[in-house]
Amino acid sequence: VLASLLAGVDRTIALGVADPARIGITGLSDGASTVNYALINSDRFAAAVVSTCCEDPKTVMTYGGTAWADWNRAVRRYPLASEDGTAFWKPMALSLNADRIETPLLMQLADSEYLLALEAFTALREKRKPVEMHVAPGEYHTRTQPLHRLAEYQRDVDWFGFWLQGREDPDPAKHAQYTRWRALRDARPNLPAVPARR
């Protein structure tokens, strides 16, 4: 999947319609797994958003519940949570690769699933990586409440605008959001600077 994704990115760049330094990636469900894998195994993306997350050793086999853990063991052949499954998890677990990930990551999650992201979020945060999490109350895998959808879509646009274009919405209601994001950016001096676009 990653090879196909990167081929599409390369083609878009070759057409002259995308700046290779300003490529973003987003995904929900299996698409979020693709985002995570891409962040671990590629440095092509300058910003990312996931709407579900994550496949990490402890959370998948613990916080997803016993039925899901049993299914993951039986169908996907996931190792037990009590086993050392580092070799299995390393290619796909954000928590085990947090030191390598530089891409700013926004996690927009349903409250029924956010526990699955805590291991990755904590690892990225502890490594001082640019990561932010928002949890929508009363939501499930796919958002159903219009206000939550609107808030997430607006935040997606703002996140990509900030990290890919250096753009900030002057709306005073978003001041705290941009203060947080500037702090994330400023804490990572090795992130490439993006010139502001108006």
Regions found by a protein language model. Give the residues of each.
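Active-site-proximal cap/loop segments of hydrolase catalytic domains
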Residues: 1-198
